């Protein structure tokens, strides 16, 4: 996989949960000339308390530090339906109780401090099917958290499906963004999945998401906005899809060709 990414012209990637040992991962990434830049961490701060989350979070940070990463991606999974196969992702998202907002914010601040011990920035991922999905929820969380400890991962695909808009969240959170995912959306597949009341997994397997250049989002506007406001971090192109229908290497080339021709050519 690392060789495929390098062959397609990419400079880095995020670590997946199914990667081999940290030693083997680093060896293979280095051999391919790729940087490992981040990994996802599922937190249950509201359900279990921040102190219960810390041991696993430290283990993830240690892993990422070894790999030379600079970001740890976090998403609060209390009540999440993103991984539940028989629940519609479009109308069953969990909602925080009023008193839980501060619990989550304070817990994230604590984890952000820990991340800094390992040379990492904590970036929060707004995500479909979770307590922090919409623009308003994301901006409220950012307002409650310490900007020196908690930053944002901005994801175009989740913003589009969650709010029907990409630029609203980007404009509102630009000063907190330290990591970016560029993911495209096929509107017809999105509406088909909504009508069929599909889960998150079944929606993306049905083709709701795709790589930049293969869907409806015009990435020139968010890209130009990021550059204008001084963003110089990583932008990862991604799209959860059925690999038997959308071969990863083929779609990696589609994404890279689009980025080179449409964004880097500006």
Specify the residue positions occupied by each region the protein language model found.
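A short, acidic, flexible beta-alpha connecting loop/helix-capping segment that sits on the rim
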Residues: 236-247
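Active-site acidic/histidine proton-transfer and metal-coordination neighborhood
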Residues: 50-152
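C-terminal helical cap(s) of enzyme catalytic domains, especially alpha/beta-barrels
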Residues: 246-266
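A cross-domain feature marking catalytic cores of carbohydrate-active enzymes
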Residues: 15-17, 36-44, 74-76, 124-128, ...
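A short, acidic, amphipathic alpha-helical segment used as a generic capping/interface helix at domain edges
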Residues: 214-228
